[in-house]
Amino acid sequence: MVSTTKSTGSVTQIIGPVLDIAFPNGQLPKVFNALKVQSTDGTITCEVQQLLGDNKVRAVSMSSTEGLKRGVEVVDTGAPISVPVGTNTLGRIFNVLGEPVDNLGPVSSESTLPIHRPAPAFTKLETKPSIFETGIKVVDLLAPYRRGGKIGLFGGAGVGKTVLIMELINNIAKAHGGVSVFGGVGERTREGNDLYMEMKESKVINEDNLKESKVALVYGQMNEPPGARMRVGLTALTMAEYFRDINKQDVLLFIDNIFRFVQAGSEVSALLGRMPSAVGYQPTLATEMGALQERITSTTEGSITSIQAVYVPADDLTDPAPATTFAHLDATTVLSRNLAAKGIYPAVDPLDSTSTMLQPGIVGTDHYSTAQEVKSTLQRYKELQDIIAILGLDELSEEDRQTVSRARKIERFLSQPFFVAEVFTGSPGKYVSLEDAIKGFQMILKGELDDLPEQAFYLVGDIDEAIQKADSMKD
């Protein structure tokens, strides 16, 4: 008969967030089991990382180890860290252990799931690539997202990352009946708080009826120990998997920032006694990244589409952390400071953003040729800008002048009013279907709208709205 009594051990060594714990003979916990340590400030949860031999294990703490001392009692819970899942998590903020941290009381969840789970079996995967329509023109036309794919979001501070994220959360709920999970991994606490406040303001989180909210938030911020930052991504992913597998929904999983996940792993790695690899990163970098990324996928039941903010240290794309991330991405959305300065929002760079989905075999020749033509027009405009700056527009050939005029219209038509920004801008948000977006850009490229003023294309939804705006400008 299996004994149900939990084995207890004691702390023998403390090095920062890493603890060595001795257990009685034959009662060692398994790797990834959660351990509870009694400290003066309450209970600390740790996760077993290594079995050292000699009846000792090495574990990483999920919270601060200040005030701990050798000899403190440790209890093996007999299972990995488990977190609440389901609709009751919507509108709430959790920490890495799945405990609510928003002062709104406990979460009454019907079920919990362990954060370490295998990726879906190959037989359950959805193999046919399909486009995930976001309702945002520039994304759907030029760098479309794959349903169940992974998208890298690149952009500095203040170029509109947060607003873009909130718009995507809003659109997946309205157009796809889906929900979102936001994993804040090692970012600023202030930003986490701002995001929460903005979500309440734009009704992404419904304070009056939390279950009608469109997002669950999981935070492991910069001030947390590396153990929490290393695992908070898995906590968010586990909540997203429940919506996909049990509720059979389309889910958006945001990870901000995927670099901090790697960084936390490298902080812990040396303390666990592993030899560092290139640039001081952990030797298990690719394995850790793969274990997280392979669980983000489309199954026959539902999908998890993940949007990951990628910080590139010192703008070095060959750094092992971003380089390992790139291997998993299906699309990149690059936000440009130049476009933001011109007031073109979303400030997505149409020439730098890429997608593996933009192939005639997947999106169709109509979409593909329109996208390529839009890009080549914008590229030609970019090349001509130096000449225009020195000599002026009048010195260009007739053909180039026409290209510039159309490119400026395209640039403005790539902007769009967002639902979540209504509160700040006063102009109602627009969801533009892919079909309407393609139609609009084709009309501009064919020259059907050459006589319309370029201002008519700025911050509108579909092309009909631009034509109406031009008519009202005449009046």
From Swiss-Prot:
Keywords associated with the record: ATP synthesis, ATP-binding, CF(1), Chloroplast, Hydrogen ion transport, Ion transport, Membrane, Nucleotide-binding, Plastid, Thylakoid, Translocase, Transport
Statement: the UniProt record of this protein carries the keyword Membrane: yes
GO biological process, one term: proton motive force-driven mitochondrial ATP synthesis
GO MF annotations in UniProt: ATP binding; ATP hydrolysis activity; proton-transporting ATP synthase activity, rotational mechanism
Gene3D superfamilies xrefs: 2.40.10.170, Bovine Mitochondrial F1-atpase, Atp Synthase Beta Chain, Chain D, domain 3 (1.10.1140.10), P-loop containing nucleotide triphosphate hydrolases (3.40.50.300)
Compartment list: Plastid, Chloroplast thylakoid membrane
Coiled coil: none
Residue stretches spanning the membrane: none
Chief localization: plastid
Enzyme type, top EC level: translocase
Membrane topology category: Peripheral membrane protein
Superkingdom of origin: Eukaryota
EC number in record: 7.1.2.2
Disulfide bond annotation, renumbered to this chain: none
Residues binding ATP: 155-162
Protein's job: Produces ATP from ADP in the presence of a proton gradient across the membrane. The catalytic sites are hosted primarily by the beta subunits.
NCBIfam families named in the record: atpD (TIGR01039)
Subunit comment: F-type ATPases have 2 components, CF(1) - the catalytic core - and CF(0) - the membrane proton channel. CF(1) has five subunits: alpha(3), beta(3), gamma(1), delta(1), epsilon(1). CF(0) has four main subunits: a(1), b(1), b'(1) and c(9-12).
UniProt protein name: ATP synthase subunit beta, chloroplastic
Provenance organism: Porphyra purpurea (Red seaweed)
